Amino acid sequence: MSERIILDDAAIQRTITRIAHEILEYNKGTKDLVLLGIKTRGAFLAHRIQDKINSIEQQLVPTGTIDITHFRDDVDKVVQQADQRAFDINVDINNKVVVIIDDVLYTGRTVRASLDAILLHTRPIKIGLAALVDRGHRELPIRADFVGKNIPTARDESVSVYLEEIDDRNAVVIE
């Protein structure tokens, strides 16, 4: 199957810059702002957005990773109970404005799992959602506050995000 490039390296960089500016406008600066990237590619994107915000505001926004593995609705409930804290960040996110970062927003189930993981032990002031790509086909009533690119797709198509940190290239492709 051939791939169709939707975003190349330069387009991804511009998109991250725009999302960073939108997050700053949404939050009116960096006060109480925390970024949580959904493992794996969302975490790398969160750090890229953190770097961009730092270059704009000269403020290092606390950034961490959230692993939703044990909060997915397609795993055994016994496994779900084993996980106490699914996020890795060095600040308390209670009473903070948390922005969840994901690479592709599709059915909404990954985002729902991340909300479950966050709200199990903490109470942020507000939670926002940023996605590099929104491909539609939602199964839950979830919408991103910040979207890099809306890509209408067929259900049988696959949207892949490649990031140089793990894939040795930057691209968003439909396969």
UniProtKB/Swiss-Prot annotation:
Coiled coil: none annotated. Substrate binds at residues 40-41, 85, 102-110, 135, 159. A motif (PRPP-binding) lies at residues 98-110. Keywords: Glycosyltransferase, RNA-binding, Transcription, Transcription regulation, Transcription termination, Transferase. GO terms for biological process: DNA-templated transcription termination. It catalyses: UMP + diphosphate = 5-phospho-alpha-D-ribose 1-diphosphate + uracil. Its EC number is 2.4.2.9. The keyword Manganese does not apply. One of its GO terms (molecular function) is uracil phosphoribosyltransferase activity. The keyword Transcription regulation applies. It holds the Pfam family Pribosyltran. Regulates transcriptional attenuation of the pyrimidine nucleotide (pyr) operon by binding in a uridine-dependent manner to specific sites on pyr mRNA. This disrupts an antiterminator hairpin in the RNA and favors formation of a downstream transcription terminator, leading to a reduced expression of downstream genes. Also displays a weak uracil phosphoribosyltransferase activity which is not physiologically significant. NCBIfam families: PRK05205.1-2, PRK05205.1-4, PRK05205.1-5. Homodimer and homohexamer; in equilibrium. Belongs to the purine/pyrimidine phosphoribosyltransferase family. PyrR subfamily. This is Bifunctional protein PyrR. The gene is pyrR.
